[in-house]
Amino acid sequence: MSNTTNQSWGGRFSEPTDAFVARFTASVDFDRRLYHHDIRGSIAHATMLERVGVLTADERDAILQGLGEIEQEIDAGTFEWSVDLEDVHMNLEARLTEKIGITGKKLHTGRSRNDQIATDIRLYLRDAIDVVDAELARLREGLIELAAREADTIMPGFTHLQTAQPVTFGHHLLAWQEMLARDHERLRDCRKRVNVMPLGAAALAGTTYPIDRHITAELLGFERPAENSLDAVSDRDFAIEFGAFASVLLMHMSRMSEELVLWTSAQFDFIDLPDRFCTGSSIMPQKKNPDVPELVRGKTGRVYGHLMGLLTLMKSQPLAYNKDNQEDKEPLFDTLDTVQGCLKAFADMVPAIEAKADNMFEAARKGFSTATDLADYLVRAGVAFRDAHEIVGQAVALGLREKKDLSEMTLDELRQFSDAIGEDVFEVLTLEGSVAARNHIGGTAPDQVRAAAQRARDALATLRQEA
């Protein structure tokens, strides 16, 4: 029976694929972005096949030359993609056969599209992770340097978005940096599990050809071949893991975004973003909108959605490969694009943030931010903490009635609540004294912030060297 489908798999079919079904099942519109990695995998596969004697040297050379020419065509925008050929693999193989004849049909020996696509995605994701890694390092560096610059800048620290205790702006920035440092570790761990090669697993059970998977793994830079052929072609947990990393990263970046949006508002007025990172209003001439952090905050939700989509995609699939897995690429690609874009935007923007130190300081003076310092003072004077808590609460109540901060009260006003209060109390009620007193590792004292920034610099430098 002749092939009536014009497909590589059409031998057992008696009629062509329905035109709508062909379009519905095709993936070339989105998986074509894998062409470079598909060609890399094919070059390694052909090289291995020649070394084990499945291909001749002339056949290998013809395949490698043909693949190189095809890559140039795609790069130049002259390659014609066909939906009828389903996917990136068959488009490239069909063009290779056009160029070099029957030898092109030998390339797929000992290989299935199942292990081919799993390999392509891992190659693509590995390269993309390296881009994300570099941008994340750049963002962290920007935060570290800004924190060192603002080590002495005092601002209110918040709980429940209510003034809690004074901190330094540098300390706050380093909190963000610590979150991103853990994200960086998660990314590096994810890359280790991405860097395992499925190629050679074939459809699901391996192949009868005398392949050497260690050769292809070495040529493609993989740490090792996958141990189990069924697992190699059927699971996408590595993509899910990247989606989980991306979700945690953007959760952190969304929290940063929320604060940046608040801080640029007239109600806070803590920072200024350069005009190049903001936009205006079509109707309100005065507006300067913090679009970059707002968009990062908004894009976080779509990355969460992609993670849930990938988890749901995989949850009920029997081994091994199923067509469901075609749906893994669009959410993964969009997650990658989104993460790379968000990181680049923030890495460019963060070093240009301008702190409005006077506004931050004045805000920290409101809300009785040194109340805990007064309680600690009383404890050091021998008052039990719970009693000290009650005493300071009464002092705060007076301040609310009189519209005075604790530091603005007279000694007599303070001593009406406790005889343990002396002249030296005012040293702990200043904002400068409050932050300076927290002079330990992890504390907000300016010297500790500078030391923490240096440790963060050193850790980031080590991480970059390990890449």
Curated annotation (Swiss-Prot):
Q: What class of enzyme is it?
A: lyase
Q: Which residues form the signal peptide?
A: none
> What GO molecular-function term can you cite, just one?
argininosuccinate lyase activity
> Do you know which NCBIfam families this protein is assigned to?
argH
- Matches recorded under HAMAP family: Arg_succ_lyase
Residues forming coiled coils = none
Q: Under the cellular component aspect of Gene Ontology, which terms does the record hold?
A: cytosol
Q: Which domain of life is it from?
A: Bacteria
InterPro entries attached to this UniProt entry: Arg_succ_lyase_C, Argininosuccinate_lyase, Fumarase/histidase_N, Fumarate_lyase_CS, Fumarate_lyase_fam, Fumarate_lyase_N, L-Aspartase-like
Its source organism is: Chromohalobacter salexigens (strain ATCC BAA-138 / DSM 3043 / CIP 106854 / NCIMB 13768 / 1H11)
| Recorded catalytic activity of this chain's protein | 2-(N(omega)-L-arginino)succinate = fumarate + L-arginine
Q: Its pathway?
A: Amino-acid biosynthesis; L-arginine biosynthesis; L-arginine from L-ornithine and carbamoyl phosphate: step 3/3
Where in or outside the cell? Cytoplasm
Which family does the record claim for this protein? Belongs to the lyase 1 family. Argininosuccinate lyase subfamily.
Q: Which CDD domains match?
A: Argininosuccinate_lyase (cd01359)
What PROSITE patterns would the database entry show? FUMARATE_LYASES (PS00163)
Its recorded name reads Argininosuccinate lyase
User: Which biological process, per GO, is one annotated for this protein?
Assistant: L-arginine biosynthetic process
Primary subcellular site in the record, as a coarse category: cytoplasm
Q: What is its EC number?
A: 4.3.2.1
**Pfam families noted in UniProt:** ASL_C2, Lyase_1
Query: Which controlled-vocabulary keywords does the entry list?
Result: Amino-acid biosynthesis, Arginine biosynthesis, Cytoplasm, Lyase
